């Protein structure tokens, strides 16, 4: 059989030999002995006979259906299987399956000269990649168009790119060798939309999604196709699109990331900065997928609004008092007292010049020219004292939201003493922000960026009068700008707390107590907040007592310590005489004026317990709650139940005395769990046994307690009397000042009966207390 060739040549990469080649030439070039070739020829004939007798299926029998072609991807080795001298067809255009008829005689393998050899799949792909322009036979009618190498293979077989636009692509833009993926078949079988032209699929991008041409899914619903960077849809489960945005994944989806929250085209930070809400904004809109309520719903339902990240700081709520007059607003005795207190009409604040009308919305403000329904005291009658919960007050408050004039008579208090010092949330009118003056109307910031002090609740800035008098040009004031309210506070509770602190501090007229002047609203100190509540008070440029102890403790002597202790006792005695307990005495809340005078400040934790001068009620008064710092808290505050806040202030004064001398605390906490406090209680009991009722020392030796044993002898007595573990046995501030050795202390500060007589105004008599001339100047001055 001269036309036969060895079986091991089938599937090799060598080109076919023509029939004209002689057997001698083939035998010479072959490396296999003749007997072996003869045996292999017998095996080849047996193989061909079984194939022709239908024992071995022809390659056409292995063709799969259209559904199997989409699911089971074919390879080049399957595409190049020869069949009946017919050109290769793509799976989409394959002829219908026909029954194979076996020929009468065996057909040799090389019967067709134009037939391609059966190459292995991997070798064929590598050959196509290395030789893109190689053809099997130049004269073959089934020769393929030139391939584009590895790039074409990756684009068609892996990335499923559409290469129909390329001039070298196969006919009709389809690959004759590689079947398309399932996603490609889904997109191909979907008919294009008649309204929108089909756009080419873009390349991979970093953004999450790209809006392409609109197509229709097999069920007829309009869908937006996605880019290849997103998950490709399948025919069984296409990607769901809603208004141009991808739907949110399920909460348990692993793809739930920050990029899934974006909306529109582009990446997370590519959205335009516009005021219109987006799906990521906190306000709900008809087209957004956010479940947060809209601002209009918040305003209508009165629900509490909590600012946070990516949310507006202040909810836009409609102001019912914007274009109405004060006479048409709801009124009550408490509302009018608050309006009168913050009006500036009393001689509590420095007026300056050019302030004929501090607040046009406040009828008690100087120079108010609006319509006023205030009546004289003779015509007021009993309706002036109507309680806020009475029917008259309720009707007037309910029907005066800007619809008409009120029937409630507006009666101003005669003086500040009629205004309560401790306000409740019901005392605050709903129009409180409109009657409180603006800080910029009277004052101006000295340095808008520098903070003189900062704490958990407020920051301190410096202001001066905007239009001062000739002798007020050098005056400087401290403005305490409060931070925002807590999340669990209402507006009424927040304003009542700030107003109560201001009402207490504005009545302080003592050289050792800081006085407050104005309660204002500002929008410049905290630019992010629309309205910041501020309190204007005396300015102490030398800082607080804690800074003096830390920085200049080595320069302070015995006389300095004694003078400062006496000034603290004086200021605390005055505060207690007004029926007020401070409840937060510590070095941080004791400031130093320009001349070295110590002044107590920060009445945020104070409690109004009785009327001024009521000593009987002061002893029996009780307070509730935990206030202050742990090292300065009295032991009764740390135990459940009520306590007398006046005695708690005396305990705190004893701890401040210890800090002045030793720059440290005697113990961390006044609790039995503290070992130092347990030792102190033992030393105090031993000390009390050797002293008589008047605290006169009988024995020459004292029980050893190092934190107290190093104090001077008279200061030891004062410390044990102030820091008595039993609250009712502690001495008061007045009793401490009456001690003989305390009265002998030379103090640089003037007494409470002496004030600045040359002050510009009556309210500024205690703005900068003078000092006395001493024989030996103190180092803290």
Swiss-Prot record:
Q: Give the keywords, sorted.
A: ATP-binding, Cytoplasm, Kinase, Nucleotide-binding, Phosphoprotein, Serine/threonine-protein kinase, Transferase
Q: Where are stretches of biased composition, namely Basic and acidic residues?
A: 64-73
* The organism's taxonomic lineage, starting at the top: Eukaryota, Fungi, Dikarya, Ascomycota, Taphrinomycotina
As for subcellular location, the record says:
Cytoplasm
Supply the source organism for this entry. Answer: Schizosaccharomyces pombe (strain 972 / ATCC 24843)
Record's compositionally biased regions (Basic residues): 112-121
Among InterPro entries, the record links this protein to:
Kinase-like_dom_sf, Prot_kinase_dom, Ser/Thr_kinase_AS
Name used for this protein in its record: Probable serine/threonine-protein kinase C70.05c
Any keyword Protein biosynthesis?
no
Q: Ranges for the Protein kinase domain? A: 432-742
GO terms (BP aspect): G2/M transition of mitotic cell cycle; proteasome-mediated ubiquitin-dependent protein catabolic process; signal transduction
Question: Which superkingdom, per the lineage?
Answer: Eukaryota
